Amino acid sequence: MDGVKANQRQQLQLLLVAARHQLSRSDLRSMIQFLENEDCGFDVTLQMADPSEQPELLELHRLVATPALIKLSPTPKQVFAGSSIFQQLQNWITRWQQDIVVTGLGLSLRPTELDGSRTQRELQLEDQLLVLRQENETLIDRLNAQERTLRMVAHELRTPLTAAVLALQSQQLGQINIEHFQDVVKRRLDEIELLSKDLLEVKSTRWEDLFNPQNLDLGNIAAEAILELEKLWLDRNIEIHTDIPSDLPKVFADQRRMRQVLLNLLENALKFTEDGGQVSLSMLHRTSQWVQVSICDNGPGIPEDEQERIFLDRVRLPQTSVTTSGFGVGLSVCRRIVEVHGGKIWVVSEPDKGACFYLTVPVWQRNGQE
């Protein structure tokens, strides 16, 4: 009997296309553990590939969004993508097992009927319909991912443009000399050029895969961000207090993206602080794994029921006064950037008592991140 069962087992060849940081997703970890340890009725072969190392796979399998799981064998090929890859796989494994019954043990059954009520042709049509539905869901996920990527990169362009405009205004008012002005504008134009290259990569690369984490001094990045926004706080007599320990460890992060997060949070804090108010920026070595950053203001605060929504895509809270425009897409971009780095971002606030935004950034580990 064991020999019969062994002959009935069919090879299931799967390919998981995912970047290294995506493999930390809980659903992907659960799926990999399931395929390695559970008996799903197949002899499973799971291959994994990083799209940054094998970009040809994106074109070969027509992938726009990753992670993606591809069933290579038995045919026909199927692609699973989106946020429910493991669930999709579990649903289809049952149907693949039914196919084995039809093509294997089913040889002794009546070919016209499988369950006594539906013909084999009806079941085949149902299978084809399910495949079409799954492909449609995958296509929608791809389009949504591409739209989200375009929105993220387009918003990133705003940061260097804002810095260049502020530098121009400061130079016209005589607040900075021409050499400083030229240096700021050149650096921001270089950044815009890099972002334009990112836009060209959107068709074949996820926004998250454009990140380039490195050994980074986060204190220096914060100091540069404060200087770039100096016109916003000097003109309004706002005090900025910093608390950055001299022994703060280096972090492992993308310099451009982390600078963008700090600029966005500082700009929001300045925008919601009244003239003559205060904004604080603090950093501390929370654990051996993380540096925690906090940016606080003494503005109008954020209602508790809105503190989760402000980090969602396409959510903009109503303006709090005639001079402020409300929190917008910048916070959703900040959340995505922080989460790609493996950290988290949150806000603590009470109405009329200001707001403190917190985020965590991974500490650079000499042995594992060189």
UniProtKB/Swiss-Prot annotation:
Which is an annotated Pfam family here? KaiB
Stretches assigned to the Histidine kinase domain: 152-365
The answer, when asked if Thylakoid is one of the entry's keywords, is no
Upper lineage: Bacteria, Bacillati, Cyanobacteriota, Cyanophyceae, Synechococcales
One GO biological process term: circadian rhythm
Going by the UniProt record, its keywords in alphabetical order are: ATP-binding, Biological rhythms, Kinase, Nucleotide-binding, Phosphoprotein, Transferase, Two-component regulatory system
**What does the record give as the function of this protein?**
Member of the two-component regulatory system SasA/RpaA involved in genome-wide circadian gene expression. One of several clock output pathways. Participates in the Kai clock protein complex, the main circadian regulator in cyanobacteria, via its interaction with KaiC. KaiC enhances the autophosphorylation activity of SasA, which then transfers its phosphate group to RpaA to activate it. In addition to its output function, recruits fold-shifted KaiB (KaiB(fs)) to KaiC to cooperatively form the KaiB(6):KaiC(6) complex (independent of SasA kinase activity).
Reaction(s) catalysed (UniProt annotation):
ATP + protein L-histidine = ADP + protein N-phospho-L-histidine
Record flagged with keyword Protease: no
* Phosphohistidine found at: 155
Quaternary structure note: Homooligomerizes. Interacts with KaiC. Participates in the KaiBC complex, whose core is composed of a KaiC homohexamer and 6 KaiB.
Q: What class of enzyme is it?
A: transferase
- List the Gene3D superfamilies: 1.10.287.130, Glutaredoxin, Histidine kinase-like ATPase, C-terminal domain
Organism superkingdom: Bacteria
Please state the gene responsible for encoding this protein: sasA
UniProt-recorded name of the protein: Adaptive-response sensory kinase SasA
Q: Let me see what the UniProt entry remarks about domains.
A: The N-terminus interacts with KaiC, while the C-terminal histidine kinase domain autophosphorylates and is probably responsible for self-oligomerization. The N-terminal domain stimulates the C-terminus to autophosphorylate.
Source organism (scientific name):
Prochlorococcus marinus (strain MIT 9303)
Database matches in InterPro entries: HATPase_C_sf (IPR036890), His_kinase_dom (IPR005467), HisK_dim/P_dom (IPR003661), HisK_dim/P_sf (IPR036097), KaiB_domain (IPR011649), Kinase_SasA (IPR023527), Sensor_HK_Regulatory (IPR050736), Sig_transdc_His_kin-like_C (IPR004358)
- EC annotation from Swiss-Prot or TrEMBL: 2.7.13.3
Gene Ontology molecular function terms on file: ATP binding; phosphorelay sensor kinase activity
